[in-house]
């Protein structure tokens, strides 16, 4: 018996043990059989193709694939990397402690030697009253001149990905190529910025105002704004733009499954490793993709949501991309042809 499948060189997924005691992934052995390769890939001992007939495995239908060998090697390599401390990070932490801020301080690559934040080009400096402090999102915050009583969140010319382009419509300040701060005539340069009402040192994530199921997978790919409250002047309710940003952030955490129709009733889930490749191509907006399934080339059409073996378009099957709750509404018999019995069934 080996620790890896010598066909795909990964940890065996739904392992099949041959008479010679060597183990392989179910999908790898099935592909070997469909290509008339009936010898063990390790010792070359012949095996009977009936070994996979009506094969079942006690695995979770929604489970992930075993951790790949390459993942373990990358983790070990990462541990061996010697990372030197960031001087700016240490300086920011010291300044934060002096101001009584005990929160975790993020790296501040746009802080100069005097502790002032500036833009990515370093052409402009902005006076601050909270040097080295960060908000709950881990990016610097500062209070501008007293004649400009708005709190600005600033990180060079960038923002955390799920807050970019948000919160620009509160207050009387709008985005400009070179905004002038009222009262101190200081330019921030060609940068993006967020504007918050007085007293708001960064907005909370708007999770409490979004109607959600107890599970994240109830958040669909275009929604996320159910139960939204209408913002009013001076209200703490985030704007529609912020809801859109938060909705997209929630969608990024949703897990999707890929199914293909059985020849009879029901559905099969794709092998988890194949599923990951399919999802990556789908998210890349590819109209179709070609991949090997069971050792044979298949075409997956994301427009018609069909798959077929290359060269045999007439024998197509339907495919689906579903959330966890949608998965439960389908009769999923197993994974890639391997039955997963219901161990709780009582006759």
UniProtKB/Swiss-Prot annotation:
Transmembrane residue ranges: none
User: What processes in GO biological process is this protein linked to?
Assistant: ubiquitin-dependent protein catabolic process; Wnt signaling pathway
A single MF term (Gene Ontology): ubiquitin protein ligase activity
UniProt keyword annotation of Zinc present: yes
Zinc finger residue extent: RING-type: 5-44
InterPro entries recorded: RNF146, WWE-dom_subgr, WWE_dom, WWE_dom_sf, Znf_C3HC4_RING-type, Znf_RING, Znf_RING/FYVE/PHD, Znf_RING_CS
What keywords are annotated for this sequence in UniProt? Metal-binding, Zinc, Zinc-finger
GO CC, alphabetical: cytoplasm; nucleus
Using the record's annotation, list all stretches that form the WWE domain.
244-321
Q: Which PANTHER family match?
A: E3 UBIQUITIN-PROTEIN LIGASE RNF146
Q: From the Swiss-Prot or TrEMBL record, give the protein name.
A: Uncharacterized RING finger protein C02B8.6
């Amino acid at each position: 018996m080996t620790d890896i499948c010598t066909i795909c060189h990964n940890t065996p997924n739904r392992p099949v043990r041959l008479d010679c005691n060597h183990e392989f992934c179910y999908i790898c052995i099935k592909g070997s059989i469909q290509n008339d390769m009936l010898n063990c890939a390790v010792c070359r001992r012949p095996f009977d193709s009936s070994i996979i007939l009506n094969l079942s495995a006690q695995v979770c239908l929604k489970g992930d694939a075993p951790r790949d060998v390459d993942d373990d090697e990358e983790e070990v390599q990462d541990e061996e990397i010697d990372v030197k401390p960031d001087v700016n990070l240490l300086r920011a932490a010291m300044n934060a402690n002096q101001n009584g801020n005990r929160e975790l301080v993020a790296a501040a690559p746009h802080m100069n030697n005097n502790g002032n934040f500036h833009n990515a080009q370093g052409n402009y400096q902005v006076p601050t009253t909270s040097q080295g402090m960060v908000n709950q999102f881990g990016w610097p915050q500062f209070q501008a001149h007293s004649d400009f009583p708005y709190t600005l969140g600033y990180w060079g010319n960038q923002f955390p990905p799920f807050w970019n382009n948000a919160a620009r419509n509160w207050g009387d300040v709008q985005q400009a190529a070179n905004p002038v701060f009222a009262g101190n005539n200081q330019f921030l340069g060609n940068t993006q910025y967020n504007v918050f009402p007085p007293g708001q040192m960064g907005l909370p994530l708007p999770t409490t105002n979004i109607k959600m199921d107890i599970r994240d997978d109830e958040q669909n790919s275009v929604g996320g704004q159910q139960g939204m409250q209408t913002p009013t002047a001076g209200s703490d309710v985030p704007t529609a733009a912020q809801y859109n940003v938060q909705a997209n952030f929630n969608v990024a955490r949703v897990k999707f499954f890929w199914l293909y129709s059985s020849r009879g009733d029901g559905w099969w889930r794709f092998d988890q490793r194949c599923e990951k490749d399919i999802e990556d191509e789908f998210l890349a907006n590819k109209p179709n993709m070609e991949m090997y399934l069971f050792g044979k080339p298949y075409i997956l059409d994301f427009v018609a949501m069909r798959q077929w073996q290359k060269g045999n378009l007439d024998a197509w099957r339907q495919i689906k991309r579903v959330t966890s709750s949608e998965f439960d509404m389908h009769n999923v018999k197993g994974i890639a042809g391997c039955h997963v019995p219901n161990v709780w069934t009582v006759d």
